[in-house]
Each structure stands twice: as C-alpha cells, then as structure tokens.
Amino acid sequence: MAYYGKCIETVIEQLDKFTPKRDNPEQFLEAAATSLQALSPQKQSFVLEVLSGCLEYRKLLTVVVDAFYVEDGRLCLRVDHSRFEVICYLATFLLEELGFQLFCNIIKSQPVDKMCKFLRFFFNPLHLCSWIKDEWSLIYEPAHVKENWIDPLMRWQPEVQELINHLEGVSASQSSPLKTKAKVTEPKEFNLTAPRPRTIPAPEPVPVVAKPRPVPQSTYQPPKEQQQLETVKRYNRRKAEELLLRANIEELRCAMPRSCRERVQGSKQQLRLQFPPRIRKTPKLTFYRPDNILVKLNTTAILREGALYQRQVEQELQRVDKLVDGAGDFSEFFEWQKKMQAKDREEQLAASECRRLQGKLSHEEAVLARQSLMQENKQRVEQQKEQMAKLMLQRAERRLREDRSRKELVEQVIEGQKNAKAAQTKLAKGRQQTVQEAIEESRGLLQRRAQAAQEEQRRRCELISQLRALETQPTRKGKLVDLTQIPGYGLEGEMSIVELRERLALLKENQRRKEEEKRDQIIQGKHTKSQELQNMVEQISLCRAAMGRSAALRWEEKKALAAAPAAPSQDERVQQLRRRISERAAERSRQAALLHVSAPRTARPKPRAQLEAQHWLELERSRERRLQALQQGGSGPGPARRLEAA
C-alpha cells in the first residue's frame, strides 16, 4: 500500500504544479518526465500514464469533482482537488486494467474518510445515469460515453459499494474511544466570614533626581541685540530731524534769480564760499559707530553708483550755474506745472474710475451670460434625453444580434471539438519530431565548439612556450652614457646634456624673477584700487544721505495729497459707463423675472447674489469718497512741491 500511496502522491504533486492558462500539456509532460528520472522505470511509467490521462480528460474529471465540492464535499479542503481527480480517473478509465484488488489497495493507501465520501458520491447510480452522463455527453459523443464509461461504472458499482461499507466499518472501529465515567463535581460552601488578609505593598524606591542647573542670568535681562536696535533707532530719528530742520531753513536758496547785468567770475568758487555746504557730517555720538556699513557692495556696484552720483552732481552744478548767470523767474513755470499735475491727477482718477466701472459692467454681462447659458443648458438636456432614448433602442437591437451570433459561435465550437483529438495527436507527433531535430542540431554545435576550444587551447600553449623561451635569453641591463659629450648628429644648436640642464636652470631663474615683479605690480594696483573704492564709498554714503532727505520730503507731500478729499469726476467716459451699467442691470432684472416665471422652482432668494450686489455698492461708495478726497487735495500746493520742481 505504501508503494501505491507514494505513486499517487507523486501524481498529485505534479498535477498541483499544472496551470491550464499558462502551461502546455505536452511541454508539461516532458518537464515532468525529466524531473522523474530518479524513479524506477515501472514506477515512472505508471506515474506518467496516470498524469497524461488526467491532463487529457481534465474537463470530464473537473465536472465530477466540482459537483462533489458543491453537494457532499462542502467541508473538504480545496487542496485535495487533484487527489479526487486522480481517483476519478482510475475508477473511470483504469479500473478494468488494474483490477479491483489493486484498486482497493490504492484506495486504502489514501485518507479513508475522504475516499468514502467521494466514492459514495461518484458511484451513486442516480448521479451516474442522470447529470454525469448528460455533462459528459456535452463534451463527447453520447453513445461513446454510455458504452465505454457509464456502463462499466454501473457494473463495478456493487463491488465498490461493498468496499465503501468495509472502509466505513474500519473508520468507525478506529474512531470509537473507550467511554469513561465523568467525575462528579463536588460543590464547596462559600466562606464569607473569614476575609482574605490584605497584602502589604512593597515600598516604592525613591527616585534619584539629578541636580537641576541654575537659571542663567540672561533669562531676566533683555537681549543685547534689542538694545542695539533701540540705540540705532534713536540715533537715526535724531539725525533725520536735524536734516529736516536744516532743509526747511535753507529752502529755495539756490532758486533765487540774479540780475543779468552783473558779471559772474568764478561762479563755482563763489558759490562754494558764499553758501554753506548742504550736506554736513554730524558729530560723532558716544553710543553709535557711524563707520559700520550695513550693506557690503562689490566693486562693480560701487563704481556704477559712484558714476551715477557724479553725473547727478555735475547736472546740479550746471543748473546752478545757469541760475547764477541770470536765468528767468520760475513763477510761470510753477503755475504751469501745478496745472499739468492737477490735469494728470484728474486723468488718473478718471482712468481708475473707468476701470472700476468696466469691472462692474463685466460683472453684469457675466450675469446675463450665465442666465442665457442656463436656458441653453435646459434645451441641451432635453436633446440629450431624446438621444439617450434612441441609444437605448439601438443597444437593445445590438444585444439581440450579439445573442444570435453567440449561439452560432457555440454551435461552431461544438463541431470543432469533435476533431480536436486527431489534431492533438498530429500536433504531438510534429512536436516530438521537432524536438528530436533540435537535439541533434545542438549535439553537432557542441561538438564543433569543443573542437574549436581544443584548437584555441593548443595555440595558446604554443604562444606561452615561445614567450618563456624569449624570457630565458640574456639581455643587457645597463648602458654607458657620457653626459658631457655632444652626440654629433649634425643638428643645429646641438649640445650636451649637462649644458642643456644649465640653460634650463637659467631660464627657470629668469621666469621666477619676472613672476615676482608681476606679483608686486598686481599688489600695488590692488592697493591703489582699494583706496579709490574706499573714497568712492564715502562719497556714495554722502549722496545717499542727501537722497534720503529728498525722499522724506516727497513722502510728506504725497501723504498730504492723499489725506485731502476729492470732488466727483465728470468725465464723459465715466458717465457713459454708468449709463451702460444701469442698462445692463435693468436687462438682467427683466431676464431674471422671465426665468422666475418660466421656472418657479428657482424663485427662491439667492443670498450669494444679494451679497455680491451689496459688495459692489460698498465698493462704489468707497471709490467715490476717495476720488473726492484726492481732487480736493490737488488744489493746495505746498513749498515742498516747488522745491521738487526746482
């Protein structure tokens, strides 16, 4: 029994490895034959015969085993699927060839409970004559099924039933253990008066706490960086106040006209002597270091900024020279400048108002477009519903045509399966012949490769022997050379090696001397350039201070202009945009009323639209207030504006 059990286990193991979707049966059998070469010839032939039969009649066996799992084998594992297929194949195709006694030995070598369930299900006369016969007749001819498979199974059914009864008796005798008398439970009374003594808890160990670090004194003191920032802020504010006071005192001194009849001699020198310098260094304070440059500039930035400030200084000096030489009064120019600035400011306000009104107009047009889009969407939805109904009808017709074509295809497949066995036999013979030819061709290739490898090995041995013979020959290792002797090849400028070395040493010395001189020149040039850059940085700092004062004056002037109220604009473009906005709003209200009438479900209030309308109204009011403030502030010019114009 152990012998047959090992054979059946080998077949089951090989069947578990087979995957119908991925593996080819012929190739799988060849691979299995190569893996089973370690077995004896008799055992190998039996395993391969059963394995090939299970693969060939896999459809028939799968029908029976799947039905067994559905009805009687619900509690059986899916791992035993291949085991049931092998038993079904042996009972159907090899029972007469093996003999009933050998079949009984094979059945007894397997698990008894599983075999009893499966054989009772498979050899049930009701199952064999009804659905098993019908299912097998769908795959093969009904006459062939009844004559070769169903009738032999029905003849063997009584003997198999005796085998099943015998196996059930054996399993019942093995599984019935000796029944022992159960021990009676003896109840015990509860002892409620004697409480359990309380356990004394173990003392907890006192944790050892590390000594904490003292709080640093810097925690209770303000940081040094904050103190330094406060110091710098106070110094900068004091310096700005001094510069503003000095600018207000010396205001418009350079713009005073002189008589044209007075002759000017040395205008630049007289100006420098007559007027004090506009920019003076403030005295050093004890709490601030003015040499601390906050921004580090590279050479290119310093030169560029220095050239810019130099051009500005030259232009300012030229303008002062023209004024000193007798230029006219600037009152007319100031009046014209004020008018042009007021006109430019009004144009800017009108342009900003136009932009705001255009935004509001685009909003109204967007609302109109959204309403028209809603109407178009309703029409499009109705069209899509009609198209969907047509598509559903077409789909139903297409399904009917597909069902008819599928039935025709099933009939064609059934007819093609009748000739499948002959085609498979022919295909197997062709594949065996192809494999034999490939094996012979590979043998020839291996022989040719072995001959080529032997020839290559022989050639390498000859080369190695020749190299070893060359290595054994004596060679002259040294050569006598006179370094002071001229070779005498007849070349121009020919010299000995000693002379060549001396000349090379002299050339290196000259080159080193030239490099040192060039290095000294570079260092001197860098020093000069750094000094010039330092002077230019000081000049740039002075010019920046002057520019800062002028920027502060312009900022004060802009603040004064922004704080003044402005009058409402009367521009034609603004009026036209307002009229268009009112027309669009009226049109939008008319369309909304039409939509409310046509679709009563959408007549509920829209809080989002109300919020948008309120937002636009508040934005328009704030814009009008700002325009009034700006226009009222443009009428009153100050001394700072005249200074900027000069």
Curated annotation (Swiss-Prot):
Compartment annotation: Cell projection, Cilium, Flagellum
Protein's gene: CFAP99
Keyword field: Cell projection, Cilium, Coiled coil, Flagellum
Ranges in a coiled coil: 368-459, 494-522
Family: Belongs to the CFAP99 family.
Protein name, UniProt field: Cilia- and flagella-associated protein 99
Alphabetical list of PANTHER family matching this protein: CILIA- AND FLAGELLA-ASSOCIATED PROTEIN 99 (PTHR34649:SF1)
Span list, region Disordered: 195-227, 627-646
Highest taxon of source: Eukaryota
GO terms for cellular component: motile cilium
InterPro entries: CFAP99 (IPR039341)
Main location per the UniProt record: other
Biased composition (Polar residues): 217-227
Annotated TM spans: none
